[in-house]
């Protein structure tokens, strides 16, 4: 597999950090609205549109630029590494959020790329653990769709 096991986790974490910075420092301002009474709030619909646009950008850039020469098997195995990291650190942050709150924030920065998935599941009022399982397990495998059927490396 030519040492490709790290590519999906590294790409997704780097993309997540960039998405987080864009949301907090730039794009999030678009979702801030002033209500008729003068109070300031965030518009959930705008935030979801912004998150969906970032998700699509991350998937398209990853799929068409970074993973297009990898086989589907390589991408699948690399995505499995990210799933394991999601589950291990997701459970860790859930259990230890009061003890290590800064790690919880740090981990959320590194998993921001697919936040639209958990936002949509929240809108569906799914059970908290079912939502977490879906959000942790499924999104990394979307990149498999962009892989080649056979090894093109020679």
Residue ranges of predicted features:
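Transmembrane alpha-helical insertion/packing segments
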Residues: 1-52
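Membrane-interfacial entry segments at the cytosolic side of transmembrane helices
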Residues: 70-79, 126-130
């Amino acid at each position: 597999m030519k040492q490709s096991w790290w590519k999906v986790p590294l790409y997704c974490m780097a993309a997540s950090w960039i998405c987080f910075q864009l949301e907090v420092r730039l794009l999030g301002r678009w979702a801030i609205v002033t209500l008729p009474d003068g109070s300031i709030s965030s518009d959930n619909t705008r935030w979801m549109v912004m998150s969906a646009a970032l998700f699509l950008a991350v998937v398209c850039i990853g799929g068409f630029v970074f993973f297009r020469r990898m086989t589907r098997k390589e991408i699948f195995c690399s995505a499995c590494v990210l799933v394991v990291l999601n589950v291990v650190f997701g459970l860790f942050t859930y259990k230890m959020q009061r003890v290590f709150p800064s790690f919880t924030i740090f981990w959320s920065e590194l998993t921001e790329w697919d936040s639209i998935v958990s936002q949509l599941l929240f809108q569906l009022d799914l059970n908290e653990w079912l939502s977490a399982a879906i959000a942790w397990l499924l999104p990394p495998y979307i990149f498999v769709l962009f892989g080649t059927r056979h090894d093109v490396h020679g």
